[in-house]
UniProtKB/Swiss-Prot annotation:
Homomultimerizes to form the nucleocapsid. May bind host exportin-1/XPO1. Binds to viral genomic RNA. Protein-RNA contacts are mediated by a combination of electrostatic interactions between positively charged residues and the phosphate backbone and planar interactions between aromatic side chains and bases. Disulfide bonds: none annotated. A motif (Bipartite nuclear localization signal) lies at residues 198-216. Transmembrane segments: none annotated. It is found in: Virion; Host nucleus. One of its GO terms (molecular function) is structural molecule activity. This is Nucleoprotein. Late in virus-infected cells, may be cleaved from a 56-kDa protein to a 53-kDa protein by a cellular caspase. This cleavage might be a marker for the onset of apoptosis in infected cells or have a specific function in virus host interaction. The keyword RNA-binding applies. Encapsidates the negative strand viral RNA, protecting it from nucleases. The encapsidated genomic RNA is termed the ribonucleoprotein (RNP) and serves as template for transcription and replication. The RNP needs to be localized in the host nucleus to start an infectious cycle, but is too large to diffuse through the nuclear pore complex. NP comprises at least 2 nuclear localization signals that are responsible for the active RNP import into the nucleus through cellular importin alpha/beta pathway.
Amino acid sequence: MASQGTKRSYEQMETGGERQDATEIRASVGRMIGGIGRFYIQMCTELKLSDYEGRLIQNSITIERMVLSAFDERRNKYLEEHPSVGKDPKKTGGPIYRRIDGKWMRELILYDKEEIRRVWRQANNGEDATAGLTHIMIWHSNLNDATYQRTRALVRTGMDPRMCSLMQGSTLPRRSGAAGAAVKGVGTIVMELIRMIKRGINDRNFWRGENGRRTRIAYERMCNILKGKFQTAAQRAMMDQVRESRNPGNAEIEDLIFLARSALILRGSVAHKSCLPACVYGLAVASGHDFEREGYSLVGIDPFKLLQNSQVFSLIRPNENPAHKSQLVWMACHSAAFEDLRVSGFIRGKKVVPRGKLSTRGVQIASNENVEAMDSSTLELRSRYWAIRTRSGGNTNQQKASAGQISVQPTFSVQRNLPFERATVMAAFVGNNEGRTSDMRTEIIRMMESAKPEDLSFQGRGVFELSDEKATNPIVPSFDMNNEGSYFFGDNAEEYDN
């Protein structure tokens, strides 16, 4: 994909910066990470958490959610205008887990949002530091991507559950900005657009008046973001059609679903970033690491190095497997929910099993679960190698694929054949081939059919030893191509419920 002059790297999106050189980007990302770390340390002090309790990922998530809630201006405004019984719009909170007499106990805490905003700003040199907030949102989104399937959401919008590899970032809040848009998969944006079009079909005033004008601007902006993710002219031309439609309706929904399917073979560019839990950054800051001075990158070796020497714990339910819980969090940390399991496994240096074989539920614990029966164990988040995260979809190579997920979205820039069976994907393309976009559809289908394995394997750099910080000696791993590469294969993951 030709990089236009206007493209900002994701680190710039992430830090809201203008064009900067590599050193400045590393410094501003470092400043953002350091701010999250300082905030976390301060919150642990305020909550009087012990060192061990501060390393508990469930406590980290509660603290992260509190700061996101404190800065959610739209929702805060809504809560103040529509007061509900027993909910103080000025307060936020959640479960904090403490170790008391050898048992874990849950304590529900409540905090003034104003107080949390003060702590956050103080940790971020007095600024609002929205980049840090977005970073936390992306970590939560990556955790959801690894934990839940979105079958129901896909079916509701008329898409096929086998397209789950396109759904990265589907739980990101609207307010996640450019950095959020960069990590959203093709399917996620298609789903947002379909929801909009459906509202327009059901509500005559949706596109009308002053509000309608704003809605229209949002619609076109979203179409442009999606267009920017496609790498072929025909897909982009089809997006222009969808964007310019006077009155978007079922024809546009059809076109969008067609485009989403085409992305299983002609993949879109989706950014991947390693976003870690706040407690990891807190631990590093507490041990004297100066992120701003050292610089930091979300797509290089830095997150791997950080995880090599961070000890994070998690509560484990009685019948869960701690190794499986570790795999889940490792995948979330590296945004690898839709990556080929063989690639992830090679980098991690441990076998990575599909979601359906994991004996673990999500990381967060529901309020009705009995915490006293739970133990805590160390999450194994280290890796054998590291690899650069990719922002291109790469291309694809014909391979047997599964009944569950039928394509992958590469996370790591590692050379490999991409697994999926052309027949499975092409079967999705029978049906509607007339209308305004017929010539583009024909062109897209032709490209998909003529895709040859060799043009289509993913050309990446390879993996690197952890001692090879400058990425000088790429190791190109060889994979057993007969194994199953899809994470959501034959799956029984829980559905994501808000």
